[in-house]
């Protein structure tokens, strides 16, 4: 926030929200933190005919999220991006992840946010096999990275996923496990 005598408060959002002057009380919650969701695994070159397919039968790239916390997390307004300068590139609809739940989002470029039935989530971008930035951002303004592969993730291999093992170390997986624990 910026403060100006007699002029109220203006936040630092891209389109500023101006609040009228008057009496204000600002309370910070010391228990507040970022949501407990991370990018757990992704596959940037899904070419094997036995690989995970979307609802159209396509072998698209995919990103797996995992809620490692003890409470459900609503992803509404959170975002995935392949460009650190555009943290809100693809914004989630209201989708809640229960504790220890996984969510697979296809990185197909189709930009689909309708869930239910056979509909799956699809980002507005696909993943580069040569390595690029990949980030998950909170819904607040300004956006803060909840998890990211920065400055870039390493070069990817056909049908090998990349992500966190049970010890939280980053590595390749010859047997991808979308929607399940990594081995």
Predicted features along the sequence, with ranges:
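Intrinsically disordered, low-complexity linkers and terminal tails enriched in Ser/Thr/Pro/Gly
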Residues: 1-183
């Amino acid at each position: 926030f910026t403060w100006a005598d007699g002029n109220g408060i203006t936040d630092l959002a891209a389109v500023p929200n101006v609040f009228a002057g008057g009496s204000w009380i600002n309370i910070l919650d010391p228990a507040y933190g970022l949501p407990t969701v991370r990018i757990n695994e992704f596959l940037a070159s899904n070419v094997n005919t036995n690989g995970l397919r979307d609802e159209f039968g396509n072998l698209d790239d995919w990103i797996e999220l995992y809620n490692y916390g003890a409470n459900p997390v609503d992803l509404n307004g959170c975002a995935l991006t392949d460009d650190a300068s555009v943290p809100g590139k693809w914004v989630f609809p209201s989708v809640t992840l229960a504790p220890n739940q996984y969510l697979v989002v296809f990185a197909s470029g189709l930009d689909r946010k309708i869930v239910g039935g056979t509909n799956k989530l699809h980002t507005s971008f696909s993943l580069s096999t040569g390595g690029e930035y990949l980030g998950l951002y909170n819904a607040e303004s300004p956006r803060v990275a909840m998890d990211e592969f920065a400055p870039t993730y390493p070069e990817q291999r056909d049908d090998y996923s990349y992500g966190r093992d049970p010890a939280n170390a980053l590595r390749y997986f010859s047997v991808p496990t979308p929607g399940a624990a990594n081995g």
